[in-house]
């Protein structure tokens, strides 16, 4: 068994309807130190069923880097600030990564 601590980093996936909204959400998460980094990927296209109808929408995919201790507050914050009734909020655990990056991530959230 390894003596290395388990990684507590998470990546949260969220989509936003446009660049301005994604930027506003990202700034809010960074200012409150709920996220260490937010990557905005414009040009995403989402296809899904909503209320029985097939929908297709251009969106901005957000990759939000945080940790488990900030996870619930971050999800709550996004639900309160997001314009969608049911925003995409998916938490992906990080099983490992570059130790320098993970150290920076943790320090950025303090």
From Swiss-Prot:
The lineage of its organism: Bacteria, Pseudomonadati, Pseudomonadota, Gammaproteobacteria, Enterobacterales. Belongs to the CutA family. Gene3D superfamilies: 3.30.70.120. Involved in resistance toward heavy metals. Binds 1 copper ion per subunit. It holds the Pfam family CutA1. It is found in: Cytoplasm. Keywords: Copper, Cytoplasm, Metal-binding. Its cofactor is Cu cation. It comes from Pectobacterium atrosepticum (strain SCRI 1043 / ATCC BAA-672). It comes from the Bacteria. GO terms for biological process: response to metal ion. InterPro entries: CutA_Enterobact, Ion_tolerance_CutA, N-reg_PII-like_a/b, N-reg_PII/ATP_PRibTrfase_C. PANTHER family: DIVALENT CATION TOLERANCE CUTA-RELATED, FI09726P. GO terms for cellular component: cytoplasm. This is Divalent-cation tolerance protein CutA. Homotrimer.
């Amino acid at each position: 068994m390894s003596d290395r601590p388990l990684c507590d980093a998470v990546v949260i996936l969220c989509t936003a309807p446009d660049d301005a909204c994604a930027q506003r959400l990202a700034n809010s998460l960074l200012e409150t130190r709920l996220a260490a980094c937010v990557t905005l990927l414009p040009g995403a296209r989402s296809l899904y069923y909503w209320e029985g109808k097939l929908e297709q929408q251009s969106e901005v995919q957000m990759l939000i880097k945080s940790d488990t201790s900030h996870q619930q507050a971050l999800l709550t914050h996004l639900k309160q600030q997001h314009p969608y009734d049911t925003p995409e909020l998916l938490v992906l655990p990080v099983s490992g990564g570059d130790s320098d990056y993970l150290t920076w991530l943790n320090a950025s959230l303090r």
